UniProtKB/Swiss-Prot annotation:
Source organism of the structure: Osphranter rufus (Red kangaroo)
Disulfide topology: none
GO molecular function, one term: DNA binding
Entry comment describing in which tissues the protein is expressed: Testis.
Keyword Nucleus: yes
Protein known as: Sperm protamine P1
Compartments it resides in: Nucleus; Chromosome
UniProt GO cellular component terms: nucleosome; nucleus
InterPro entries the record matches: Protamine_P1 (IPR000221)
Job description of the protein: Protamines substitute for histones in the chromatin of sperm during the haploid phase of spermatogenesis. They compact sperm DNA into a highly condensed, stable and inactive complex.
This protein's UniProt keywords: Chromosome, Developmental protein, Differentiation, DNA condensation, DNA-binding, Nucleosome core, Nucleus, Spermatogenesis
Principal place of residence: nucleus
């Protein structure tokens, strides 16, 4: 039982960290939304920018 309790506390700390990172990403997204919107639309039509955009998203 002790072992289970330990793992549970560990997961909770991890979740907290992830949540903080997510909020930061959201704020950044809001900042670049206006600028990125025009570019993303043009890139999607071409098709080559789509791969690049996904990679950038993953890094965040």
């Amino acid at each position: 039982m002790a072992r289970y309790r330990h793992s549970r506390s560990r997961s909770r700390s991890r979740y907290r960290r992830r949540r903080r990172r997510r909020s930061r990403y959201r704020s950044q997204r809001r900042r670049y939304r206006g600028r990125r919107r025009r570019r993303s639309r043009r890139g999607r039509r071409r098709g080559y920018s789509r791969r690049r955009y996904s990679r950038r998203r993953r890094r965040y």
